[in-house]
Regions:
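N-terminal cationic leader/targeting segments used for protein routing and processing
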Residues: 3-4, 17-23, 28-34, 57, ...
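A short, sequence-level motif marking secondary-structure junctions
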Residues: 56-59, 122-125, 147-149
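Glycine-centered tight beta-turn/hairpin loop motif at sheet-sheet or coil-to-beta transitions
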Residues: 45-48, 114, 136, 146
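Contiguous, well-ordered beta-strand patches that form the walls/edges
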Residues: 65-136
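Bacterial Sec-dependent N-terminal signal peptides
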Residues: 4-5, 15-40, 139-141, 145-158
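Short, solvent-exposed loop/hinge segments that bridge or flank secondary-structure elements
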Residues: 34-59
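Sec-dependent signal peptide recognition
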Residues: 2-10
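A short gly/proline-enriched turn/hairpin at secondary-structure junctions
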Residues: 43-46, 62-70
Length: 158
């Protein structure tokens, strides 16, 4: 019996060791990602302007997209930068964030000092975000990529 237990423990140890040494085939970085993508709301807060949420390297920012010449003129005046139709421009940085991705790869939680956001249904072209502010109020946002909405990005104004 001692021999059996010894072999069982040895077998489990080897299995655990081999499981920890899985080859990284690079598939984890493929597929949809909530970070590094300009996420757009379909609604225009002002004529010719679309708001953009951008998450990258632990920094959450709001950008704006100039959908028309009128929107570009408005953004140029507001940001004091030269903005043309089709440009994306930083309007204001929001805060730092941390992200916890769920195992399914299409959902997770984004935590920041200004509140918490839960995302789900992540695809290459869209994501549903439920945002909770510090007072517990919620907002549901269906966000899309510009490519999906059919608008070209002609440049990013820093």
């Amino acid at each position: 019996m001692k021999k059996f237990i010894f072999y069982a423990v040895a077998l489990l140890s080897v299995a655990s060791l081999l499981n920890g040494c899985k080859k990284d085939d690079g598939n984890e970085s493929k597929g949809p990602n909530v970070e590094g993508v300009f996420w757009f709301e379909e609604e225009e807060p002002a004529p010719g302007v679309m708001m953009v949420l951008y998450l990258k390297d632990g920094n959450m920012s709001y950008y704006a997209y100039a959908k028309s010449d009128e929107g570009a003129a408005m953004l140029s005046e507001e940001t004091r930068k030269i903005v043309k139709k089709g440009n994306i421009v930083l309007t204001f940085p929001l805060s730092a964030y941390t992200i916890v991705k769920n195992e399914d790869g299409t959902s997770g939680t984004i935590n920041s000092p200004i509140g918490k956001m839960e995302y789900s249904g992540l695809t290459e072209n869209s994501v549903l975000i439920v945002a909770y502010d510090s007072e517990g109020e919620t907002a549901r946002l269906q966000l899309y990529t510009l490519e999906y909405l059919g608008f070209p990005v002609t440049g990013i104004v820093e």
